[in-house]
Amino acid sequence: MAKKDGNQEEEISQMEEGNIHSASNSDSNVGFCSSVSVVVILQKLIAEAIGTYFVIFAGCGSVAVNKIYGSVTFPGICVTWGLIVMVMVYTVGYISGAHFNPAVTITFSIFGRFPWKQVPLYIIAQLMGSILASGTLALLFDVTPQAYFGTVPVGSNGQSLAIEIIISFLLMFVISGVATDDRAIGQVAGIAVGMTITLNVFVAGPISGASMNPARSIGPAIVKHVYTGLWVYVVGPIIGTLAGAFVYNLIRSTDKPLRELAKSASSLRS
């Protein structure tokens, strides 16, 4: 019994890491593996949907309230976005990884940090969370075209695309550093990511709306039927996050050889 329990714990651990394999060919173990894997994946999807819901509800809600009542101010909007992301990272990060962003999920999978087979499920959960949050805001407030809380390019599409790529690059560069590097202090990941989003909204908010997240733009667009420049907020964040992760991994990949060279130099001097 102890051995069986140990095998089950090992299987659960593998499932949580996205490596779902059956350690036994027996029908009982296969059934256990299947049932637990479904539960684990459902937990992750629910966490992503809830996390994305509150990110969009608070962030877009601050935009709507400011446009309707004028009481939040632009700095308040920036801080709200950063705070809600930070809070939700610490709340469900240990369950789902706290992506809340299809571009981040796709990038993690391309760089081997997330299983491909879960990507469509994560994206669906994120979009559902965004759509539900946008629908909630539309029911709570009289959202006129002037009070639209989605993202629409203020200038040209090219300008908004460029700035979305840049700020998404910065966001993923920071995420790669604080959430995937073993040398980083994991406890500060939420703070670092939240502050990065706050800074990005300060810089890019007046130009593109500082989406950095296809789900953040798609949800309000579907609910309010505003599709102007929507492609910018799908293409830009994906390109930016891929580039940010690539550059960070390029820098990190040179770290080990440099340390080995330093050790060799030290041994020669001694």
UniProtKB/Swiss-Prot annotation:
One of its GO terms (cellular component) is membrane. It is found in: Membrane. A motif (NPA 1) lies at residues 101-103. GO terms for molecular function: channel activity. Keywords: Membrane, Repeat, Transmembrane, Transmembrane helix, Transport. The keyword Protease does not apply. A motif (NPA 2) lies at residues 213-215. It holds the Pfam family MIP. Pollen specific. It is a multi-pass membrane protein. The chain crosses the membrane at residues 45-65, 72-92, 121-141, 160-180, 188-208, 231-251. Aquaporins contain two tandem repeats each containing three membrane-spanning domains and a pore-forming loop with the signature motif Asn-Pro-Ala (NPA). Aquaporins facilitate the transport of water and small neutral solutes across cell membranes. Belongs to the MIP/aquaporin (TC 1.A.8) family. NIP (TC 1.A.8.12) subfamily. This is Probable aquaporin NIP-type.
